[in-house]
Amino acid sequence: MHLSAVLNALLVSVLAAVLWKHVRLREHAASLEEELAVGRRAADPAPALRIDYPKALQILTEGGTHMVCTGRTHTDRLCRFKWLCYSSEAEEFIFFHGNASVMLPSLGSRRFQPALLDLSTVEDHNTQYFNFVELPAAALRFMPKPVFVPDVALIANRFNPDNLMHVFHDDLLPLFYTLRQFPGLAREARLFFMEGWGEGAHFDLYKLLSPKQPLLRAQLKALGRLLCFSHAFVGLSKVTTWYQYGFVQPQGPKANILVSGNEIRQFAHFLMEKLNVSQAGGPLGEEYILVFSRTQNRLILNEAELLLALAQEFQMKTVTVSLEDHAFADVVRLVSNASMLVSMHGAQLVTALFLPRGAAVVELFPYAVNPDHYTPYKTLATLPGMDLQYIAWQNTMPENTVTHPERPWDQGGIAHLDRAEQARILQSREVPRHLCCRNPEWLFRIYQDTKVDIPSLIQTIRRVVKGHPGPRKQKWTVSLYPGKVREARCQASVQGASEARLSVSWQIPWNLKYLKVREVKYEVWLQEQGENTYVPYMLALQNHTFTENIKPFTTYLVWIRCIFNKTLLGPFADVLVCST
């Protein structure tokens, strides 16, 4: 009897534990489903999206998946899906073929060479590819019951969510503009991150982009074994990226940068509004120089001395900020009102995109690290329309560096290398150009601590910042280009058998009358028909008579374009055909 009671008690306790765990799992799944179904209630006054399950299932089983993509290659492709599905068990996407399926582009096996598209903005990286497996819609009868996601989904990969430079450059900026590439997407979309990382150190920043909570790949398993998206966009626009990290060739600016400071500043303004950060009046009530303080590695060993020297040189308050000790909104508040930002090379410098126009960015490099080889922040600061002053300073004195050869390899340690290689690295005066990401000499040098040589730093800054640093009270204007010249005409006259004159005239581009332009000139190309060469002319007036080398009874092709301020070249007008 006693034994029976013990067994009963044990059975009851085990059953209770199992039931408790089951209830907790159900509650977790239910909370995620509720988040998917009614996530817009808190942040969006519009009614929650609902799925008519029988109708959705019928559309999927009969019609199948629908895909239309833009872009010619996998590196610039974005795809729009209806009824794309995801197996949380296989961790693969599924394209179900039904009687209404569309797959554009229809690539066949080329879809695997190497992929349909890049899920992240890091171009052609073999860990970032997107593809799907194909099944007939009839296979749904033998598969787990689909769970339909009612939200419009934007599906992408974050590249490195623990590094602030990667977060901004690879993820936030591209997400921001991809969401605005399609009508309504910024208000409706839920972000699905499929790379497999946890939330990371900066997940709160991703939450600012959409009124709905982003979901990670690991969370999808709790929703169901087979998820189907009624409407999904897959991939990210790369148009806002300006830097490549050196996976194929040594790192540097992208060959064809398509973003300007205007787009960067529009994004920064959006983020500042979301963070409730104001640029109207500095938080300290006066102009100041902001110095980024690092607390773990790449330290400025004489930071206090540096602060004092900057204050004395520029007659301005100097303050420090760090990512470790300040909330990110406070970092942005300080940066967005600073006259000068000083920092060792590092991810925190991406916050320069919040600096006011006219401010200075001073990037410090450790010994043996050539500033010309590592330029993500220089490239950002010097984008047209950013209107920042950029200064790079490098420690050239080996006695002013403190190395850490005993640290783990990923923190710059070299103790794991053979002695000859250690000796070579210690004697090297410059890190050679290299590929990402585990070059031991690069890691050894970039994780050094530095005693800044104050006189050389001040001298370097003064080469660029001549007077008082900080925003200038001047009107910063976007560079606007001329349109085509209008009403081009030509008139010819022949004088004898060997001489001729060709008079050409035109009207100004119509947008010129609405612009304030310092200098307007016209470039005219004159080409004899049938010849491969042309003669260029730069003219200040809207008419000109050409006499040199003009032949009688000859046809000439004339191209004309307007140029503003010597550098803003407008388009050529339609070719003018003139006969003498």
From Swiss-Prot:
Localization: Endoplasmic reticulum membrane
Name of one Pfam family that matches: Glyco_transf_61
Any one GO cellular component localisation term in the record: endoplasmic reticulum
Biological or metabolic pathway of the protein: Protein modification; protein glycosylation
Record keywords: Endoplasmic reticulum, Glycoprotein, Glycosyltransferase, Membrane, Signal-anchor, Transferase, Transmembrane, Transmembrane helix
Principal localisation: endoplasmic reticulum
Lumenal side: 26-580
Signal sequence interval, chain numbering: none
Keyword field contains tRNA processing: no
Domain Fibronectin type-III, residue spans: 488-580
Membrane-spanning residues: 5-25
Catalysed reaction, written as an equation: 3-O-(alpha-D-mannosyl)-L-threonyl-[protein] + UDP-N-acetyl-alpha-D-glucosamine = 3-O-(N-acetyl-beta-D-glucosaminyl-(1->4)-alpha-D-mannosyl)-L-threonyl-[protein] + UDP + H(+)
GO molecular function, one term: protein O-acetylglucosaminyltransferase activity
Record-level GO BP terms: neuron migration; protein O-linked glycosylation; protein O-linked mannosylation
Bilayer topology: Single-pass type II membrane protein
Segments on the Cytoplasmic side according to the record's topology features: 1-4
Residues that carry a glycan: 99, 276
Alphabetized SUPFAM superfamilies for the sequence: Fibronectin type III
E.C. code: 2.4.1.312
Function: O-linked mannose beta-1,4-N-acetylglucosaminyltransferase that transfers UDP-N-acetyl-D-glucosamine to the 4-position of the mannose to generate N-acetyl-D-glucosamine-beta-1,4-O-D-mannosylprotein. Involved in the biosynthesis of the phosphorylated O-mannosyl trisaccharide (N-acetylgalactosamine-beta-3-N-acetylglucosamine-beta-4-(phosphate-6-)mannose), a carbohydrate structure present in alpha-dystroglycan (DAG1), which is required for binding laminin G-like domain-containing extracellular proteins with high affinity.
Similarity annotation: Belongs to the glycosyltransferase 61 family.
Annotated protein name in UniProt: Protein O-linked-mannose beta-1,4-N-acetylglucosaminyltransferase 2
